[in-house]
């Protein structure tokens, strides 16, 4: 359908206006990282959660982690990084050799998932 695309930063994204919910991308995803949204979005009245910058995804479309692109595009960290109680997640610019994430990648043994499938992963796991 053309709903899945790679943005200028290399992130795999979904255009919700083009997604028809056929789930072909879910079947093709080598990471099994996509889910189908079966329900209408529900927001509890008066509840404070989520990020207003994130578009609401309606029922019948695919979803996946975007590393909080709305936040990272504005220089903020993804919420999982910001909220991790163990500070076990680091987000940064791999093209900047002085960034914390680049230093960690150089100094530690970093692994990626499914690189052999040509996925060009941008998430690194460091021990």
Tell where the protein language model's regions lie, with residue ranges.
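Non-ligating segments of multi-cofactor redox enzymes
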Residues: 1-127
């Amino acid at each position: 359908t053309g709903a899945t695309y790679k943005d200028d930063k290399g992130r795999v994204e979904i255009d919700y206006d083009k997604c028809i919910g056929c789930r072909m991308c879910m079947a093709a995803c080598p990471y099994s990282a996509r889910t189908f949204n079966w329900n209408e979005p529900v927001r509890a009245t008066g509840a404070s959660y989520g990020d207003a910058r994130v578009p609401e995804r309606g029922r019948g479309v695919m979803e996946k982690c975007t590393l909080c692109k709305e936040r990272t595009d504005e220089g903020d960290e993804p919420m999982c990084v910001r909220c991790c109680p163990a500070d076990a997640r680091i987000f940064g610019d791999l093209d900047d050799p002085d960034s914390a994430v680049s230093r960690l990648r150089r100094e530690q043994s970093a692994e990626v998932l499914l690189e052999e499938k040509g996925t060009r992963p941008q998430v690194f796991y460091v021990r």
